[in-house]
Amino acid sequence: MTEPVIVNLWPDGSTHNPVDPNERPRIEVYQPAASSAMPKPAVVICPGGGYVGRAPHEGEPFARLFAAHGLVGIVCHYRVSPHYFPAPMADAARAMRMVRRLAPRFGVDPGRVAIMGFSAGGHLACTTATQPDLYCDPQDDLAPHYSARPDRVILAYPVVSMLEGLCAENLLGKGASQEQWRQMSNESGPHGVGMAADLPRLASWTGLLLTWLSGWE
């Protein structure tokens, strides 16, 4: 497996780029080591962290797992607090569109791009899937040409309600209206376990996930 390729989501000079270069919205693309002429499915991964950080154990390990099994694993480094709504949503939508735009470069089938999210990243993935056009960023020049809607969705212990809790405050800020909280709620075990390799009752879930993805036609 090759080392990841870093792709910045927004061009130099964009107001979406924080001052700290380590916080610049970007994707890390992990490709399978074996080359193939056949386009492959891709999974865009949104790590959790309560919209205040991004948990490392919910990003790179899964991208490498997917790449080791012939898929393209992509970690999405989206903006978090104090960058409130719509910043994370704009980054996730941009990431989906960017993957489809760069599909020939990375050997991706643009019709088989999944999104995966953990905890707050699960909320971001769920929102991208159910409300891909919730916020149309005026700086996203890819929006007229590429869809942000994923072809499959993988939610691992996701946050689905924005009606209470710090996760909502970190996304929307302290002055958000009830209407905004409801709009960000997608709902009508164990948390933060990542691959759960040390939990016998859960450790098989990554294998089941790979089996499910291997049959993606």
Language model region names:
Residues 1-217:
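Alpha/beta-hydrolase superfamily serine-hydrolase fold, recognizing
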